[in-house]
From Swiss-Prot:
Enzyme Commission number, as recorded: 2.3.1.-
Domain of life: Bacteria
Gene Ontology CC: one annotated term: cytosol
SMART domains recorded: cNMP (SM00100)
Keyword Magnesium: yes
Protein's name in the database: Acetyltransferase Pat
SUPFAM superfamilies assigned: Acyl-CoA N-acyltransferases (Nat), cAMP-binding domain-like
InterPro entries: Acyl_CoA_acyltransferase, cNMP-bd_CS, cNMP-bd_dom, cNMP-bd_dom_sf, Env_Response_Regulators, GNAT_dom, RmlC-like_jellyroll
Length: 333
């Protein structure tokens, strides 16, 4: 018995260090530790294959793997699974065939479990919600971005936010000036790492974000965050990089956000901003905004989510945005 307890304790310690279990008390991992089995794989080994039935999941302790998804258009999208990550959970959550092929890049160790272990893991406090969020983020990476052509001919892309956008925004070459950040966050201080993490870690249901990119760099984003007391209301916010301001991106994004909101059951948009944020006020005024003063220099408003007929978007663009929004919002039930 002592040997079994010691083995389980070692597994609990290893599991507790993984991202998916961050913040979970060790005692909550005991049942899971008893239901998973050790995994060791050589470089180049296929662990999961796209299209196959889902019967297990993997937790990576060391090493890395390539995650490859081939879309209906035949284009392969490649990602990487690193230590601390879980793979194989999407198909189990959706009760569907595998959505990607996972191949080890180097020798890999970890843990594997079946449906029983997965059920145990989902019921660990906080883990189920984290798995749903992670699954939606991964599925969002498989969505093809929507080409967007601005009035001046600039070609950009629209897509849902992805986890790596925080690093791409912070370390990219696109500049967001102090004035732009002040208007967005209503503070002269640079956004903290914790806030930047929150802004990029979304679930696409209660917190949805569109990102506009130029190449691989995010140049603008628009988000809605659902009200905790009234799920039909969501607060919206926009950020556009300095070099891209005044080119119609904000007007386009409120249209894209409105389409996604209607898919998600949001009926009204709330906005809170600095009173001198004229570009955003102008956009909101087009949809009947009535402003209230909340504090010195801060105003608020509430508008109905604009319908397709009110948006400055073509029918084809609305349909594309609707399809992509539905893909990520309804990705995991």
């Amino acid at each position: 018995m002592d040997g079994i307890a010691e083995l389980t304790g070692a597994r609990v310690e290893d599991l507790a260090g993984m991202d998916v279990f961050q913040g979970c008390p060790a005692e909550g991992l005991v049942s899971l530790a008893a239901s998973v089995q050790p995994l060791r794989a050589a470089a180049g080994q296929v662990l999961l294959r796209q299209g196959e039935p889902a019967v297990s999941f993997l937790l990576i302790s060391s090493g890395s793997a390539e995650v490859s998804h081939v879309g209906d258009d035949g284009v392969a999208i490649i990602a990487r699974a690193l230590p601390g990550m879980i793979v194989g959970e999407i198909a189990l959550l959706r009760d569907s065939p595998r959505s990607a092929t996972v191949t080890t890049i180097e020798p890999l160790t970890g843990w594997t479990g079946g449906r029983g272990a997965f059920a145990t893991m989902v019921h660990i406090p906080g883990v189920g919600e984290r798995l749903l969020r992670t699954a939606r983020q991964r599925l969002a990476a498989f969505v093809s971005p929507i080409p967007v052509r601005l009035a001046d001919g600039t070609q950009l892309m629209l897509r849902p936010v992805l986890p790596g956008d925080r690093e791409r925004t912070v370390h990219g070459h696109i500049q967001f000036s102090g004035e732009t950040l002040y208007r967005r966050f209503m503070s002269a201080r640079v956004p903290s790492p914790a806030l930047m993490h929150y802004l990029s870690e979304v679930d696409y249901v209660d917190h949805f974000v569109w990102v506009v990119t130029d190449g691989s760099d995010p140049v603008a984003d628009a988000r809605f965050v659902r009200d905790e007391t009234d799920p039909t209301v969501a607060e919206i916010a926009f950020t556009v990089a300095d070099a891209y301001q005044g080119r119609g991106i904000g007007s386009f994004l409120i249209g894209a956000l409105s389409v996604a909101a209607r898919v998600d059951g949001v009926e009204r948009f709330a906005a809170r901003m600095l009173s001198d944020n004229v570009p955003m006020r102008t956009i909101m005024d087009r949809y009947g905004a009535v402003w209230q003063r909340e504090d010195v220099g801060v105003i608020t408003t509430m508008i109905d989510v604009p319908g397709p007929g009110e948006l400055s978007l073509g029918r084809e663009m609305v349909d594309q945005i609707n399809r992509v929004a539905r893909q990520v919002i309804e990705a995991v039930g």
